[in-house]
C-alpha cells in the first residue's frame, strides 16, 4: 500500500496542502494522490532546524496541534543549526530527516513525499538557477522521483486566499523577508515583474521539462543496452564508452548511474577519474562508491534515498 509523507512547516502553503488533503478538496486526493485514504495513508513530517530558537519550537508545537485537529500522525525532527546556516544546508538536513522517516514507515511499501511548493516557488528556483549559472536542468527544476508537488500550478496569492476563505491558521517565517538570502531578493524582483514576464518563464519551464523528459528517456534506453548489474548489485559500465562519448553526454550518463546524488563538479571529477584512474582505485562520497578495474567502472549506491 502506498504511503504519503506530507512535508508541513506550518506556513500558509503547507497548511493549505494539509487541508486540501484532509478535506479531499475538489477530489484532490484522487487527482494527485491515487485516491489515498486520510488519515490512514498519510504521515505529516515537520523538521525544526533550530535556527530561530524559541520561534522554531513554537512552529513545531503548532504543527503538532494542527495534526491533532486533523487526526493525522506526525513525526517531528529537531536540529541545532546555527542562525547563519545557509538555505542549501538547511534543506539538506530537512530532506535527510524526510528520508529517514520514509525509510522507517516504508517496509515493503512505496513512500512518496508531498510538498507545498507552488508556482511562485518554481519561478524563484528558475531565477535562482539562472543567476547561479545553471545548466539546462536548472531550467526544469523540481523533478525528483517520488516527490510530489500538487500545488505547483497554483500562485501563492491563490493559496493565501484559500487559507483565508477556509479559516486556516498558519505561522509566518520572518526569515522569508530577510534580504540576506538571495532567494528572498529574487522574490522581491519577480514580484515587480509583469504577468507576461512570469508567463514567459513558465513557458520556458514547460519547454525544458518536455526536453528533460526526452533526454532522460533516451538515457534510460542507452543504459538498458550498455550498463549491467553484477551479483553484488553494483552498476557496471565500460570505461571505453565514457572515454569515447562527448563529455556532456558522458556526464549525463554518470549522473544517471549515480542516481543524481553527485553535484556537477563531482561528476566532472568522476569522469576524469574514469578516464585516467588506475585499476583498483576508488572514489567515495556519502552515498556513492566507484571502483575501477582495467576496463570497467563499478558503481555502488548506499543508504538509498528516495529524495535528492
In which residue ranges do the predicted regions lie?
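AMP-forming adenylation/ATP pyrophosphatase catalytic core
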Residues: 1-13, 25, 43, 47, ...
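Core alpha/beta nucleotide-donor-binding catalytic domains of modification enzymes
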Residues: 1-189
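Residues that cap or delimit alpha-helices
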Residues: 155, 194, 244-247
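Amphipathic alpha-helical interaction segments
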Residues: 181, 185, 203, 252-253
